Curated annotation (Swiss-Prot):
UniProt subcellular location: Secreted
Cysteine amide modified-residue sites: C60
Disulfide bonds: C29-C50, C35-C55, C39-C57, C45-C60
GO cellular component: extracellular region
Signal peptide: 1-23
Designated name of the protein: Potassium channel toxin alpha-KTx 6.6
InterPro entries attached to this UniProt entry: Scorpion_toxin-like_sf, Scorpion_toxinS_K_inh
Main localisation: secreted
Keywords, ordered alphabetically: Amidation, Disulfide bond, Ion channel impairing toxin, Neurotoxin, Potassium channel impairing toxin, Secreted, Signal, Toxin
Keyword Nucleotide-binding in record: no
Length: 61
């Protein structure tokens, strides 16, 4: 019983610490300008970086 409780707490803590899944869709890019439109649709903010040919969207504020 005690081991199951600890495992449950570990799972809950892990899911709380993981980043939001918003913007998890893979967006292919070549330049940061390619990320502005798709990032605006996903996060409401056009801020994004093109890293390893995938967009990484940032949130505003």
């Amino acid at each position: 019983m005690n081991a199951k409780f600890i495992l449950l707490l570990l799972v809950v803590a892990t899911t709380m610490l993981l980043p939001d899944t918003q913007g998890a869709e893979v967006i292919k890019c070549r330049t940061p300008k390619d990320c502005a439109g798709p990032c605006r649709k996903q996060t409401g903010c056009p801020h994004g970086k093109c890293m390893n040919r995938t967009c990484r969207c940032n949130r505003c504020g």
